[in-house]
Amino acid sequence: MELGPPGGSGPAEPGPRLRGLRGADAAASASSLSRFGAEAGCRASAVAAVLPAGGSGERMGVPTPKQFCPILERPLISYTLQALERVSWIKDIIVAVTRENMETMKGIIQRYQHKRISLVEAGVTRHRSIFNGLKALAEDQPNCRLSKPEVVIIHDAVRPFVEEDVLLKVVTAAQEHGASGAIRPLVSTVISPSADSCLDHSLERARYRASEMPQAFLFDVIYDAYQQCSDYDLEFGTECLHLALKYSHIKAKLVEGSPDLWKVTYKRDLYAAESIIKERISQKVCVVMDTKEDEEHVGHCLEEMLKTELNHVKVTSGQDLQQIILEQCYNFVCVNVMTSDFEETQRLLNMVEESNLSILYPVVVISVHFLDYESVPLGQKMEKVMQIREFAKEAKKRNILLSGLLIYFPQEEQKLRESLRQGTTIISALIKERNSGLIGQLLVA
């Protein structure tokens, strides 16, 4: 068994832990853990998770196994690990990967600072991979470094959007019933064809459900079931709940899951997952400005217009910027009124870099300059273009997407608001699209 980096808890959703959980994430995690202990009588070290990640991704039609396909330049499996890591009461996460991908997986753990991860070699089938993961937690195995949990969660490496409340429901149900799994209503009607490819009969859709992940089991229930499995089950079986029923005689409690439990299976699913992630990290933007009268006025006008495009906009003079970064804001607009330098933007970049905010998600920084075009010489504009390009090249190495925006600053209020509306459209597009091809560009509104 290969061990990932030692240490405490990992990233909170959606960003990295800087000094443990903070704010709403901390409260939510503490609340869930408290409920977990109260409702299920669970010890703090009683839950582990197993992720089979040895698939080849044949249905996706790409050479890279789907769990390692990049979304916003980060492997898909890293998002799934993050979703489990943010749950403080999951103490160990076992990932089963093929021997040829073992070093790749170690690199992912190190680069994205994942914690509580242990690696085992995957089997040739999904069930054999899960069995190998369970063996890493079993007390009867030689050289076992981990404690046997009371409950084990089995999840798919390519379901990145699992939420803590679903995990809590299946674990609590497993403690009471021995086994539990998430289900969803069927989307399409299931039919049975005859031997000559004609309709034989159809199932009444309302009576059936699709089995999803995560699933949870008392460890002894599922481990004993796998120990009794036939080779046929290990080679061709797909449903863990069925193994618990067949070999341990445990009827699983079925828990209604949320719509975001879907599995990345086809190439189009990668695009859908990317859109969801972009949407989640694009809804909060911080507008950084000076306390000068002109700048405050422009900043608050910009705030007013950005709120029509984005859910949460906060304006700050920079004094509480560190706290905003800790609250995991991934979008910053640095306002510069009647100035052509990048000093304020450079200070902001330094703070973002020092915070490690950009380890998991690309951070968008837009340096906005309000200038009277007639009073700024052309040579100064070109100098600005070259300057932001150099800043952007260095920032991109740390996953920060820096762009510049020139907005006309007329004296008339109506014309200023028109300029701001045009600028807001560009800012919103840069934040939502997160197109790395536009870094270092100086756009004009």
Swiss-Prot record:
Its EC number is 2.7.7.40. The record marks R59, K66 as: Transition state stabilizer. It is an enzyme of class 2 (transferase). Signal peptide: none annotated. Residues 1-24 are annotated as: Disordered. One of its GO terms (molecular function) is protein homodimerization activity. One of its GO terms (cellular component) is cytosol. It catalyses: D-ribitol 5-phosphate + CTP + H(+) = CDP-L-ribitol + diphosphate; D-ribose 5-phosphate + CTP + H(+) = CDP-D-ribose + diphosphate; D-ribulose 5-phosphate + CTP + H(+) = CDP-D-ribulose + diphosphate. This is D-ribitol-5-phosphate cytidylyltransferase. It comes from Bos taurus (Bovine). The lineage of its organism: Eukaryota, Metazoa, Chordata, Craniata, Vertebrata.
